[in-house]
Design a protein with these regions (language model features):
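Alpha-helical transmembrane segments of secretory-pathway, organelle, and plasma-membrane proteins
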Residues: 2-542
Length: 542
């Protein structure tokens, strides 16, 4: 019990919102500023020693960085995500991913631009359907068949892709040497459809304990799950899915917008005459723009602290197995009556594509060699004719199948995700296609956000260098360029995933963004140097 409490405490600590911690930090750091009559910018006026003056300048620099930059990084939406990263939203260890997002956004604010716009577009796409929004944002789990799935010991209707020439095979009499067969999941028909997981890996609303042969999974390619929701589940538009209101994100975004706008306004008289278009106050512009986007996200996009388990035909099938440890509680959605397992039909019928409904069951029999060992027999019935096979598992580590001198086991393919076979690929592509509303939302806001920083710089400075050095101008412009390039990279990766479902390795992506962050780090160093020069910092040794 103590170890369980310790684990629970760690889990609680890991889930503490970074926004809450930052809000408390701001109270602690900024509140004492009332006791120091020193403006955020301009010349520091103190009547004490130079050491105290320098300390106040450093304090003001820290406050300037927190108010204009750090708040934005803390306010990015982390209760929802896009593409294949949606599976990280409700994981117990998602704080690592969130910390990585916060770190990139600190140095490259526009890194989160495409991500935020896509989240807004997905919310528009869901059209008020809470279940669909939870799916698109990464807060939905489903039950799927596992690789070791087998039919029940009693006859049940199973939709399968039959082996080649199945209809031409003769019935196999009991006692004869049985051919071998395996049951495999249709990996080709459900490519990138889901990622297996466990209840221990996620913060889950309710209880999910599937029986052997089944596992929890996070939908990866959302088209498969969206098809299932629209075809097999009763109307979900009236179903309310709990989500976390974005109060803290909204408040922090508003705070950063106010502080950043004031800093930008003050820079016209205190910085631009000296530094020209390299003025460090201008670097706040992308952060203010992103705070506006974060504000929209906080107001309109659902944010989730735990996963929801969707009730599907496969989940209903797992319940019918009657395993003692099977338990589900807190599920959402109801399966349409005609898609419940007990209503899959008394007579086999054709399903989608090349899948056929047959009757299947397994039996344990003693081996015919006289030993006491038993073997699993698969009985497949189609059109009133039954065929028997010795069931062997597929993959490495299984009992030898198709050994020398024996025929290769025949394969019965089943869908892991959908009980009656994978949906047509054209249908999945249509559901995953970028809709006109998504395209309009993303393109219009993306172009506006990308152009606006240059408009602001030109309007305030005319791109005049004034007294700034070449190095200062180079670092500040490289920072802006790397920032905007990170936005294009994020958008490009998402489009590549939507179109081709190619996965760029995490290591490559992290290295790429780490390289871009070098420009951001150089920009912060240049910013700090210019700020200290403006404040008359004397570099005193106290």
């Amino acid at each position: 019990m103590p170890s369980h409490n310790w684990f629970s405490s760690l889990t609680l600590l890991s889930r503490l919102s970074f926004q809450v911690v930052l809000a408390l930090f701001l109270v602690i750091v900024i509140a004492p500023a009332r006791a120091a009559p020193v403006s955020l910018e301009g010349t520091v006026t103190v009547d004490t020693s130079a050491c105290f003056a320098d300390a106040v300048i450093i304090y003001n620099l820290a406050s300037y960085l927190v108010g204009n930059y750090v708040i934005h990084a803390a306010a990015i939406p982390v209760g929802a995500d896009i593409g294949r990263y949606g599976q990280k939203v409700t994981r117990r260890d998602n704080w690592r991913w969130n910390l990585w997002l916060n770190t990139i956004s600190l140095f490259l604010p526009f890194f989160a631009l495409s991500r935020t716009l896509i989240l807004l577009a997905q919310q528009v796409r869901s059209d008020g359907d809470g279940v669909l929004a939870a799916l698109l944002h990464g807060a939905l789990l489903v039950v799927v068949r596992a690789p070791d799935w087998q039919p029940s010991t009693r006859d049940e209707v199973v939709y399968t892709r039959l082996p080649t020439k199945f209809a031409q095979q003769d019935d196999t009499p009991y006692g004869a040497s049985l051919p071998e067969a395996t049951i495999v999941l249709d990996a080709e028909g459900e490519e990138h459809a889901y990622q297996p997981t466990t209840a221990d890996d996620h913060l889950l609303h309710g209880i999910a304990s599937p029986p052997p042969g089944y596992t929890l999974a996070t939908p990866v390619r959302k088209g498969y799950a969206e098809f299932l929701i629209k075809k097999h589940i009763n109307d979900t538009k009236r179903l309310k899915v709990h989500y976390r209101p974005g109060f803290i994100v909204t408040l922090l975004s508003l705070a950063q917008m106010v502080i950043g706008t004031v800093s930008l306004y003050v820079s016209q008289t205190t910085q631009i005459p000296r530094w020209g278009y390299a003025a460090y106050g201008l670097s706040v512009t992308p952060y203010v723009i992103m705070s506006i986007m974060n504000l929209l996200c906080g107001v309109f996009v659902d944010s989730y602290t735990c996963a929801q388990l969707l009730r599907t035909p496969i989940l209903e099938e797992s319940v019918r197995r009657g395993h003692t440890n099977t338990e589900y509680d807190g599920t959402i959605g109801t399966v349409k009556e005609e898609y419940l397992p007990q209503n899959w039909g008394t007579e086999p019928r054709r399903s989608r594509g090349d899948y056929v409904a047959v009757r299947m069951r397994t039996e344990d029999r003693k081996k015919s060699d006289g030993s006491k060992d038993s073997e699993t027999i698969l009985v497949v019935t189609l059109d009133g004719k039954s065929r028997e096979y010795r069931l062997v598992c597929a993959g490495s580590g299984c009992e030898a199948a198709g050994a020398e001198g024996t025929a290769k086991p025949v394969e019965f393919a089943v869908s892991a995700f959908s009980h009656d076979g994978p949906p047509p690929k054209d249908t999945v592509r249509r559901l995953e296609a970028i809709t006109p509303r998504e395209r309009t939302t993303i393109i219009s806001l993306f172009l506006l956000a990308m152009i606006l920083p240059h408009v602001v710089v030109y309007a305030l400075t005319g791109y005049r260098p004034n007294h700034s050095t070449v190095a200062q101008r180079a670092w500040m412009m490289a920072w802006l360029a790397a920032d905007q390039f990170s936005a294009c990279s994020t958008l490009g990766c998402w489009i590549l995933w939507k179109k081709k479902h190619n996965v760029i390795p995490d290591g490559v992506q992290r290295a790429w963004y780490a390289g871009l962050m070098v420009a951001g780090m150089g920009g912060f160093v240049t910013l700090a140097q210019m700020y200290l020069q403006d404040q008359g910092y004397q570099f005193q040794t106290c």
